[in-house]
Amino acid sequence: MNHLPMPTFGPLAGVRVVFSGIEIAGPFAGQMFAEWGAEVIWIENVAWADTIRVQPNYPQLSRRNLHALSLNIFKDEGREAFLKLMETTDIFIEASKGPAFARRGITDEVLWEHNPKLVIAHLSGFGQYGTEEYTNLPAYNTIAQAFSGYLIQNGDVDQPMPAFPYTADYFSGMTATTAALAALHKVRETGKGESIDIAMYEVMLRMGQYFMMDYFNGGEICPRMTKGKDPYYAGCGLYKCADGYIVMELVGITQINECFKDIGLAHILGTPEVPEGTQLIHRVECPYGPLVEEKLDAWLATHTIAEVQARFAELNIACAKVLTIPELEGNPQYVARESITQWQTMDGRTCKGPNIMPKFKNNPGKIWRGMPSHGMDTAAILKNIGYSEADIKELVGKGLAKVED
């Protein structure tokens, strides 16, 4: 396989990934591959570009490092070109409503006829099979959260609330990335392709697993938070200091002992309710739970965030200031690790946003390109798989492909 022009870097150099999907979930999977060195081709509709392009800034992050192919993959010669592309592809990711590709004639079996080693990742709201009532329904972040039991666990005691921004999309996209890599590892061992069925609601079901297990194995429903505080454990969650908010986790024998001395509760240590060796204070089951919250709230309210952080660092209590967005890039940890970076857009502007993550020591990822324009790489990609300029012109003339203006 001849690769498209791009630098060689990262742990996935030499891997070709193609994805078809709009907005966040499917493209996020492709984005991770692109930042780790894979050659990633982004398929867009010929007539209508990905709707994410209407956003002013986010696409410059979510579509960086990609090659843009505008092709009608379901019709006539456009379908033929897509299947030819699949012959040189390692991983194909599609995000749609249920078995949309199969309904339009592009089944796993058709793809494997062209490439028996192909890894195929199907990402949808409700999966590739199940009941007709659900399988073909559209789904977005909030739909997956609501259907999975994840949303009902979030928010305040008085009202559930979705976790934002777009949590289900990102969890599902990352699941597609990791699952496809696992499949690719096996394919290179066996030579046999794989098809992965990723249902967004099942991803969120698994992500919401912690307290669900108490219901499935005993019928206990975990209450939601009250003003950001852990529903079960005192000293855990969101708290207000004299000048802003922190989060903290009061966990550990020494941590509880020393903290209680500071807030005036040393006298309850070693009691039947708080015996020696206590590592967590249950908010409900421990009679002193409400008192712990009362004393902790009062102590924190009289101290600044900096004072609390300094003292908790001495006591080895996990704690962090709730940073505002403007505070991020000036934070010394962000600066030291270059967590926020800059890159050039295709039209020469400077864009600022999150850097590559995670950080590979020996084969680091990199940002080598901004978001390509609609159809920008169509001609180069088609030439790469054997199409002549005349062939490409014919596809464009039939409305089956779009090249850069």
Curated annotation (Swiss-Prot):
Hey, which pathway is this one from? Answer: Amine and polyamine metabolism; carnitine metabolism
| GO-annotated cellular components | cytoplasm
Molecular function terms, GO-annotated: L-carnitine CoA-transferase activity
Chemical reaction(s) catalysed: crotonobetainyl-CoA + (R)-carnitine = crotonobetaine + (R)-carnitinyl-CoA; 4-(trimethylamino)butanoyl-CoA + (R)-carnitine = (R)-carnitinyl-CoA + 4-(trimethylamino)butanoate
Compartment annotation: Cytoplasm
Per the Swiss-Prot or TrEMBL record, the active site comprises 169 (nucleophile)
- Keyword NADP listed? The answer is no
Protein keywords? Cytoplasm, Transferase
Q: Which GO terms describe its biological process?
A: carnitine metabolic process
* Alphabetical list of Gene3D superfamilies matching this protein: Crotonobetainyl-coa:carnitine coa-transferase, domain 1, formyl-coa transferase, domain 3
At the top of the EC hierarchy, this enzyme's class is: transferase
Where along the chain is CoA bound?
97, 104
List the Pfam families.
CoA_transf_3
NCBIfam families on file: PRK03525.1
Q: How does it assemble?
A: Homodimer.
For this chain, the family text in UniProt reads: Belongs to the CoA-transferase III family. CaiB subfamily.
Its recorded name reads: L-carnitine CoA-transferase
UniProt gene name? caiB
